[in-house]
Amino acid sequence: MSSPFAPIITADIDWRDDLPYSLQFDDIYYSAEGGINQSLYVFVEGNNLINRWQQLPTNESNVFTIAETGFGTGMNFLLTWKLWEKFAPQNARLHYISCDKHPLKKNDLIKCLQKWPELSVQAEKLIEHYPVLTPGYHHLAFSNNQITLTLMLGDVLECYEQLLFCGDINLEQQLRESYVNAWYLDGFSPSKNQSMWSDNLLTVIAMLSKEGTTVATYSASSIVKTALTNAGFVIEKRKGFGPKRHMLCAYYEKAYSSSKKNRHTPWHINYPVTKDERTALIVGGGLAGCFIANSLAKRGWEVTILEEKEKVGCGGSANQQAVLFPKLSTYKSPFTQFMLYSFLYANDVYKELLKHYDLGELKGSLLLAHNEREKANQQSLIHWLELYPELGQLVDEKQSSELSGISLPCGGLFIPSSGWINSPELCDILIDNKRISLITGNRVQSINYNQKNWVVNDIEASVLILANGQQVNYFHETNHLPVKAIRGQITTIQSTQESTKLKIPLCAEGHVLPALNNSHRVGASYDIGTSEPELNALDDQLNLDRLKRIAPDIMWSQNVLDHWAGIRAASPDYLPIVGPLPNALEFKEVYSELKSNSKRWIAEAAPCYPNLYVCAAFGSRGLTTIPLATEWLAGLINKEISILPRKLIQAISPARFLRKKIIQGP
């Protein structure tokens, strides 16, 4: 998988007779007589899509997945989207997965899509949401989540291989509940781009397919035919589009073998468990619980939230001005990768919400270089930020003062797409769905499984999700999870004539928010190991002292109007804990041999409690990481292909701590 900080090399395009030509691959993106008609003939008709769509069940649970090997101009996606909305059942959902090693720059994409005015409605939305071209996975949602695009930027084999659970053909088939329904093999000519048509890639494609999965490609070369046949596909040669003599269609019958070199023990995933009903019970009504409830409800699930307090958005999610910003670093780790993916996705989610609700601002935020260590960290990002100025810009003292609206003692890192969101109000919006029921004042002390459903406080559901923050490890089943409580207190002070000029959040040792209702929120204390949210006057003074260091030239009020304390839940590696919950004793038995060789191949999935999931430990960056994590988890529960690479699924897996303990010893 590509490192998030090794930049993508975008497409080098030469326009010839008003057609885009790839200088990297010495080939055209589409011919003068091609474009929409070619896509319709080769991919839509070649996969018999319209007839298949019209026969789909009419419910929200049905997801039809199309995967493509070369995104290019995005025209195949846009045409598929338009036809889906015309021919598919209204409640069915389309998941489109694509990949590009050299994606088009936004300006080139706009120029390409101007050629097809019949796709202008879809093209306008794609252009609006077109991601920052950082390596890895980008997940975009359209039409109220009815159309989703997972766009992977990087090497096609590496990207699709990360969608596999383990890479062993036999075990993969046992574990997989989600498959690609149709493939668009669309890349430059095999003679120009051999990696797009390799045996290794076609083997991965086979492992992501099921019996009856179809393939269509404009190419009819012997290389492609042989690779498809070897991977288990039955080939049919058809007349090609326009002057082209032939094209290929195929359907998946059976895979014969897979390489033993690329197998990965699937300790992060469980064997499939039948769900008789599409009902889910969520313990916890904070941001995590409300986001996962919303994601499941959009998929047609009936959801019940059990919340201990009197309403949602209390506890650690009660901050009325929670700050959204990424943790940017040159250090290449699952943490930085997950933070970047999460920030980009969350930013897209909140921008859409802000079109309809007044619950915050995304006008940027400023991370001040308040000491030498922070300054060095920010300076290390110079080269990367030159390539991706949309994510951040280093600014000097004068620029930081101009951006913030007040006098500041230093420069810093300006993140233009960040800002703040009212978390409690966001929770209310997320659960405003007829499929979501809320039960408040309901303390959960035990969970029970009756061999069919989970039962909590006499309420029964087929799926149970524990999203109750620092209390997530209070149960027998979860007591091995190393969750730590971190208390934080926010102080609210009166705004002054001078302080009201502050336009964006400022972050240093602490942080301060722009005035809202004539007051500023200043925070936050950080008390590790404290699990009770009692208010503390000393923390108010700590926050005020930090505020003075953030902007010493400003006359800040010392009048404390209010204060609030909440408990953050965090893991030892500061990544969230999201996914199926393993049975600790059985897990240690199954994977005991990892102690002698951490990379040993063990042909067993994780022994997990049936249909029991954890969604917790988001720490102080829940606003940033929860949207992506919960969307992935909802897809897993609903039997959909992952929107995250395997490495990141493992990085947030509840089983990672048990595995680490086996390898390193007690």
UniProtKB/Swiss-Prot annotation:
Residues 1-253 are annotated as: tRNA (mnm(5)s(2)U34)-methyltransferase. It catalyses: 5-aminomethyl-2-thiouridine(34) in tRNA + S-adenosyl-L-methionine = 5-methylaminomethyl-2-thiouridine(34) in tRNA + S-adenosyl-L-homocysteine + H(+). Residues 283-666 are annotated as: FAD-dependent cmnm(5)s(2)U34 oxidoreductase. The keyword Transferase applies. One of its GO terms (biological process) is methylation. One of its GO terms (molecular function) is flavin adenine dinucleotide binding. It is found in: Cytoplasm. Its EC number is 2.1.1.61, 1.5.-.-. Coiled coil: none annotated. Disulfide bonds: none annotated. GO terms for cellular component: cytoplasm. Its cofactor is FAD. Keywords: Cytoplasm, FAD, Flavoprotein, Methyltransferase, Multifunctional enzyme, Oxidoreductase, S-adenosyl-L-methionine, Transferase, tRNA processing. InterPro entries: FAD-dep_OxRdtase (IPR006076), FAD/NAD-bd_sf (IPR036188), MnmC-like_methylTransf (IPR008471), SAM-dependent_MTases_sf (IPR029063), tRNA_MAMT_biosynth_bifunc_MnmC (IPR023032), tRNA_MNMC2 (IPR047785), tRNA_S-uridine_synth_MnmC_C (IPR017610). SUPFAM superfamilies: FAD-linked reductases, C-terminal domain, FAD/NAD(P)-binding domain. Catalyzes the last two steps in the biosynthesis of 5-methylaminomethyl-2-thiouridine (mnm(5)s(2)U) at the wobble position (U34) in tRNA. Catalyzes the FAD-dependent demodification of cmnm(5)s(2)U34 to nm(5)s(2)U34, followed by the transfer of a methyl group from S-adenosyl-L-methionine to nm(5)s(2)U34, to form mnm(5)s(2)U34. PANTHER family: SARCOSINE DEHYDROGENASE-RELATED (PTHR13847), TRNA 5-METHYLAMINOMETHYL-2-THIOURIDINE BIOSYNTHESIS BIFUNCTIONAL PROTEIN MNMC (PTHR13847:SF283). In the N-terminal section; belongs to the methyltransferase superfamily. tRNA (mnm(5)s(2)U34)-methyltransferase family. This is tRNA 5-methylaminomethyl-2-thiouridine biosynthesis bifunctional protein MnmC. It comes from Legionella pneumophila (strain Corby).
